[in-house]
Curated annotation (Swiss-Prot):
Pfam families: Herpes_U55 (PF06501). InterPro entries: Herpes_U55. This is Uncharacterized protein U55A.
Amino acid sequence: MNSTPVSELSQLIQFTVDFNDLQPELNFSPAEITCILSHERPVLLLITDGTENNAECVTLVGHVLKNKKVIKINVFPMIQSINFVNIFALPIFNITSSLLIQDNCYFKENMDPLRFHQFAYLEKGLGTTPIILYSVKNGDLIVNATVTKITWEKNEFQPLLKNSNDQKLETMYCIFTFNTTYCKYWNVFFASATPICNVEMISEHNLSVYKIEYRSPVLFVFLRYLKVMNSRFCVDECSLRLRLSKPNMQSVALNICMPYFNISEEFKTMEIYFPERMTLTPNHITQINLRGTFENPAAVGLFIPKKSNVLSFPFIWQPRETFRIYVYCRNETFVTEHDIIGHVYFISREQFPHSFHPTAHADCKSKVEAAFNSFRINFLGNDFFSDSLPILTVHPMTDFPYEQIQETENIRHNSMNITPRFKRMQL
């Protein structure tokens, strides 16, 4: 009697691929591993390289796992070696496009504007008081504002940006303020916590809410406007609708809205773009600092690079830290503000309490050691035990017909290649 394959539960999955019998003079295609995994809630599935060698290629893939999914992994052959692939999942936070309102005094930010390409500081006198209408909807405070007679300020340090017509753009800023003393709902909803803000509507194209600061009882709303260089036309009024809500500790919000942070609430990830057009010098490490922080103390950001001609390392992004990344290329490479560097996933700080910026490709691998009734996993400078991780369901291959498996997207496109050259980097 034939038995029906059953699903298995696991918190750590390890695949072993033996290449010891390969002959050096022959060329081989990557070995392909296929498995079917699921979890009842969205989790971050990490496919990591557990091979202890000096290979030029390190596999690191991040994938949000929802429901049942066919996973295909390509393992590149290493002559006369045994390759290990370690797979595990991490709890993942929701990321919201709402702005984290900074509860602090209005001040000039102390930073190097040559590094922070989107630096902006405005004198308080440039602010204007708009017409404000308040309402309440589903427990949130709705603010409808009409701002007129806008005075825009051009910052001295301009990023190199162009629109779809290849026209250069200037970045302009202004502030409008409103006094929460005149809003009878403010203390009802936000007496104990500063709210987050979702911009539900803004009337003008290329206009955005850049950030919001709160110095009790006044809110400072910073507007950012992209204007075609040397154009006479400039928006002098706008209307917008803001939804102010209580912060949710199960999600992560940034304190700034910039085009290099592209948030996908549906896929629980944030795409990271280059801040401007630039030419990367070959064999030279370029440091890029992107303005914007988050403050949820229970979360950290895990950056995973996208596979491209521009090489970078994964790292752990801690709350209130600047997003700082190092990129490198072998040949002169021109990049634009439309080129993706990688993705950030927000995960629990319980597994990753320490900051970590790798300086060698070996630092990006995972190491598994047996521990009492569990396994200790070392990954990106942090240690945690497998029994603290979400339980994955490993399904038999009969759960999916062969044709459906063939059509499943291969996730190797998110793999990252790191060359041994990085071992000599001094960051």
